[in-house]
Amino acid sequence: PISIYATILHGAFGTGRMLVTLHDIAILLCISLAVTPAFRMRFWNTGAEGQVLIGCLSTAVCMLVLGGKVPDGLLILIMAVSAILSGVIWGIIPAFFKAHWNTNETLFTLMMNYVAIQLVEYFLKVADKTGSNVVGPDLLTHGWFPEIFGVKYLLNILIVAIVCVAMHIYLRYSKHGYEIAVVGESENTAHYIGIDVKKVIIR
């Protein structure tokens, strides 16, 4: 068993693998940050997977349609905006139902994950006529983050670190963060002090 665990640790943190592991951790941390405001309100959003899939789908479309036609810097910006907007729209749907009809956000967002999975699978089949369900690097050659100091994933990790700090400041020191905290503690209290609870939930 010791040798097995040693192999696992070496595979994750050994030479050349540390940044890959940190990159994977950064992705998971970024997804966690996306649902942090909802959890702060004690609304159990289990739809992060669906939002990520829809965001990935929109960025892949941008790569396929605009790759090679616009500079990579502009393409990355378009992809980022597209991913954020598509993820927000996907998240607003259960938030709207929760705010207006008090639906169960856990089940709603969980079911939307399966809708997102089917949508991505459908578009994979449209893009890939071979039936392999893979749109590989040969098609997605533009819009990748550049290397910094020859390090492939450093920029990704730095961006997530900045987002993490920004989220902490937003939740702890902003008016919106205060409203989120109050709604999470007590919706009745939030109503009493004049907070628009429906607006906070959807936002």
Report each predicted region and the residues it spans.
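Short, amphipathic, aromatic/basic-enriched membrane-interface segments that mark the entry/exit
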Residues: 16-20, 77-81, 148
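Membrane-helix/interface signature in polytopic inner-membrane proteins
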Residues: 166-202
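Single transmembrane alpha-helix segments in multi-pass membrane proteins
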Residues: 3-66, 84, 88-92, 96-103
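Transmembrane helix-bundle core of multi-pass membrane transporters
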Residues: 11-16, 105-173, 200-203
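Hydrophobic faces of alpha-helical transmembrane segments in multi-pass integral membrane proteins
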Residues: 26, 30-33, 54-58, 62, ...
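Membrane-interfacial loop-to-helix junctions in multi-pass transporters
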Residues: 15-17, 25-28, 69-76, 152-158, ...
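Residue-level recognition of membrane-helix boundary sites in multi-pass small-molecule transporters
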Residues: 48-51, 74, 105, 155, ...
